[in-house]
């Protein structure tokens, strides 16, 4: 009886710790896998990878009705998470273009983080993409300057500048700057483009993004 009880305890602990050690965003990735099982991902689509600015763009297809889009953004993700789950985020798909929006949360997660580290993280993910898709178009959308994260703007601006310089040198790559279109006539970030949390965008914000993104869409 003691042996049975001991075995039960060991099994219980094993199950408990196996659940506890699942990495952050594991469930999001499982949800993507389920979606891909329910419907085979279309080939030659535009694949969106990144954080909540994509996640909350649930009706993105209606903004680009002539494009086939696969949205694999997951809220709260950092570039480190894109790197950790790169195989899951890239292997199931055969896109003609990948567009990335990520980096804000890296700074939000660690306010002392240097811009160079975020640029390094981005280059790592870019390299992972190129290992699988050497010739497709890859674009990076600049980090927006969310009012709720104003103290992080200096690092974000530096990272944007360095990623832009990197992408300019790469073939079949582009840096999509959405920061200017989100400013008013005086160069200030328009708060009316954000919902109450001053982090996520209103439909009007996405309309402005669409205007900037369209020339880059394949």
Predicted regions mapped to residue ranges:
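Oxyanion-hole/transition-state-stabilizing segment in secreted/luminal serine hydrolases
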Residues: 54-63, 68-70, 81-119, 139, ...
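Sec-dependent signal peptide cleavage junction
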Residues: 16-32, 40-43
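Charged helix-capping and loop-helix junction motifs
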Residues: 115-123, 155-160
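Generic structural signal for well-ordered alpha-helices
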Residues: 86, 122-127, 160, 164
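Catalytic nucleophile-elbow at a beta strand-turn-alpha helix junction centered on a G-D-S/GDSL motif
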Residues: 44-59, 77
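Catalytic His-Asp segment of secreted/periplasmic serine-dependent ester chemistry enzymes
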Residues: 144-218
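Structural recognition of the beta-strand scaffold that forms the well-ordered cores
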Residues: 46-49, 70-73, 97-102, 137-142, ...
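Bacterial Sec-dependent N-terminal signal peptides
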Residues: 1-20
């Amino acid at each position: 009886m003691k042996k049975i009880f001991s075995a039960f305890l060991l099994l219980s602990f094993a199950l408990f710790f196996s659940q506890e050690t699942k990495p952050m965003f594991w469930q999001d990735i499982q949800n993507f896998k389920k979606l891909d099982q329910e419907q085979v991902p279309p080939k030659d689509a535009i694949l969106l990878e990144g954080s909540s600015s994509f996640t909350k763009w649930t009706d993105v297809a209606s903004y680009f009705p002539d494009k086939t889009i696969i949205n694999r953004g997951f809220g709260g993700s950092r570039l480190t998470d894109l790197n950790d789950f790169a195989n899951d985020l890239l292997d199931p798909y055969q896109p003609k273009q990948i567009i990335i929006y990520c980096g804000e949360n890296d700074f939000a997660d660690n306010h002392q983080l240097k811009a160079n580290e975020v640029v390094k993280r981005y280059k790592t993910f870019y390299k992972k993409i190129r290992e699988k898709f050497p010739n497709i178009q890859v674009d990076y959308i600049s980090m927006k300057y969310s009012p709720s994260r104003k103290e992080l703007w200096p690092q974000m601006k530096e990272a944007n500048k360095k990623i832009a310089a990197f992408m300019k040198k790469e073939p079949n790559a582009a840096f999509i700057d959405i920061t200017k279109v989100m400013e008013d006539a005086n160069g200030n970030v328009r708060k009316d483009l954000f919902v109450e949390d001053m982090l996520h965008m209103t439909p009007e914000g996405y309309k402005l993004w669409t205007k900037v993104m369209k020339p880059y869409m394949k």
